[in-house]
Design a protein with these regions (language model features):
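ATP/NTP phosphate-donor binding region
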Residues: 1-82
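Short, well-ordered alpha-helical microsegments
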Residues: 30, 94-96, 124-125
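Cofactor- and metal-binding active-site motifs of prokaryotic enzymes
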Residues: 64-72, 121-122, 129-131, 137
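Short acidic, glycine/serine/threonine-rich loops at helix termini
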Residues: 98-100, 127-130, 148-151
Length: 169
């Protein structure tokens, strides 16, 4: 039995590429751990904006209303482009609600974007895969990236920038 071909990965990131911060799940109370993750992405040469309204944005236990969180995922940059990396700031609860709340605009754009996260973000990663889009990385959230061991950070960097990955030992 032949397996269907895997969808191609998004283009590798390059220094200067834009990163959009996404709060698709639970609310983020403080920026301290988020800032540490942002600093790592900036050290890789990526253009990461300020977290702005993502910190302290609450709607019950969620990081905003369903429409606000969907907007985090689908918003275009001021020049009309899409950021090549959507980096989720935290997991928790609530991202699966977005699958019923109008996440339909993303699949046509998602094949050229990476989506990084785990925990509750897994529902978004699986939804991308089910729609034939790769580039979903079940990896650190921005609030956990700085606490990852260096080898893990380096593997993520190599994956996103299209460099080879050595086998895990």
């Amino acid at each position: 039995m032949r397996r269907p071909p895997l969808p191609p990965l998004p283009p590798p990131l390059r220094q200067g590429d834009r990163v959009r911060l996404v709060a698709a799940s639970s609310a983020l109370e403080s920026a301290e751990r988020l800032e540490a993750g942002i600093a790592i992405l900036r050290s890789w040469g990526l253009d990461v904006g300020e977290p702005g309204p993502l910190v302290g944005r609450w709607w019950g236990y969620l990081a905003g209303t369903d429409s606000e969180r969907t907007e985090d995922l689908t918003r275009q940059e001021p020049d009309g482009s899409m950021a090549p990396l959507l980096a989720c700031v935290r997991g928790g609860w609530g991202s699966a609600r977005l699958l019923d709340a109008g996440w339909t605009g993303l699949p046509s754009l998602a094949s050229s974007q990476w989506l990084l996260g785990f925990s509750d973000v897994t529902s978004l990663l699986w939804s991308r895969w089910a729609r034939g889009c790769s580039g979903g990385v079940h990896g650190p959230l921005l609030t956990t990236l700085a606490s990852e061991p260096l080898w893990s950070q380096e593997r993520l960097h190599n994956l996103l920038f299209g460099r080879g990955l050595a086998p895990l030992e």
